[in-house]
Design a protein with these regions (language model features):
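Phosphate-binding/switch region of NTP-binding enzymes
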Residues: 34-35, 40, 44-45, 129, ...
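Conserved inter-motif catalytic segment of the P-loop NTP-binding fold
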Residues: 2-4, 18, 22-23, 38-41, ...
Length: 324
């Protein structure tokens, strides 16, 4: 006979207790999160931005984030994925190795055959985070207003967290009346632990059981030329982290190296990492690169983004980016 796994509180109460986060205080680790908004609110771009940051070991919006292997289910099509990823990397730097995967398969929550295929791919590639874009493209037959259908989806999301050991971020829409929030049954609002609303280029923490409920994170969307034909794609920047491209790459390099150098990253190693990820690094212009690097280091320190500690070591300043 199968049995429930039951824990004794007093066997563990003296342990070091802490919440586990994918993105500190914002997105819980191994729990479902829904990101929703109206058409044109950049919610899909936000999902891709989060995926690219997590997969390259970058923090999101200045909040400490867990480096992850990410799978994007681009169920509305993948035509925008590579152009937008290119625009992102032109401004945040190119990762030295890829931990970001995407696919556009047929998929429906609660379908055992499709879920078995998906789970095999997740385990094969060691995926930690799955982004579903969008909920409406992955729903079983029926209406989101049907509590039974909504329960199938929320139970599936919970299963992916509890049994598969992954964190899910699902992209959703508002209904015809956007003031009523996330489209469909109240089951979504009640049963999903974290809900983020995207409106007017702001991420609003609408529901968060243990973190930053009510916090607001404004962002700006830019266009970036991605090829010699002048074609462009959009990328996202958090408003309180506006920096020059090389400065963003310095921050990315610091975050990549911080686990190896816990007391601070040696300036020489930091410069070497930035050189590797900078798409515009020119071997014939090492002197100008070094000059601009030093200038950017001083500017970042002046604005409190980094700290130059003893012996030429550099650390990232931790900041609370939640706005009132």
């Amino acid at each position: 006979m199968e049995r429930f796994e039951i824990f004794s509180l007093y066997d563990q109460i003296d342990d070091d207790i802490e919440y586990q986060w994918l993105i500190d205080g914002l997105i819980p680790l191994q729990h479902p999160t829904i990101i929703y908004g109206e058409k044109g609110s950049y919610k899909t771009l936000l999902g891709l931005h989060i995926a690219l940051c997590l997969s390259s070991g970058m923090n999101v919006c200045g909040l400490e984030s867990k480096s992850s292997k990410v799978l994007l289910l681009a169920l509305e099509g993948s035509n925008d994925v590579m152009p937008r990823a290119k625009a992102h990397m032109e401004n945040y730097g190119y990762p030295t190795e890829s931990s970001f995967y995407y696919t556009s398969p047929p998929f429906a929550f609660g379908n055992p055959a499709l879920e078995a295929i998906l789970r095999h791919e997740i385990e094969d590639k060691g995926i930690n985070v799955m982004i579903v874009d969008t909920l409406s493209q992955a729903r079983p037959k029926g209406s989101f207003n049907d509590d039974g259908l909504a329960s199938i989806i929320t139970r599936s999301l919970a299963k992916y967290s509890e049994e598969w050991g992954i964190t899910t971020l699902s992209i959703g829409h508002t209904g015809k009346d956007s003031s009523k929030g996330l489209v469909g049954s109240k089951v979504f609002q009640n049963d999903v632990p974290c809900i983020l609303k995207v409106k007017s280029k702001k991420v609003i923490v609408e529901k968060q059981r243990s973190g930053r409920t009510g916090a607001i994170f404004p962002f700006t969307v830019h266009e970036q030329e991605i090829n010699e034909r002048g074609q462009t794609a959009i990328w996202l920047e958090w408003d309180d982290q506006k920096m020059k491209p090389r400065q963003r790459m310095i921050i990315q390099a610091l975050e990549t190296l911080s686990n190896e150098y816990t007391d601070g990253v040696p300036k020489k190693e930091l410069k070497k990492e930035v050189w590797q990820i900078d798409p515009k690094a020119d071997p014939n212009k090492t002197d100008s690169f070094r000059t601009q690097f030093n200038r950017d280091i001083n500017e970042l320190a002046k604005h409190g983004e980094i700290q130059i500690v003893s012996d030429g070591l550099i650390k990232r300043n931790k900041r609370n980016n939640a706005a009132d």
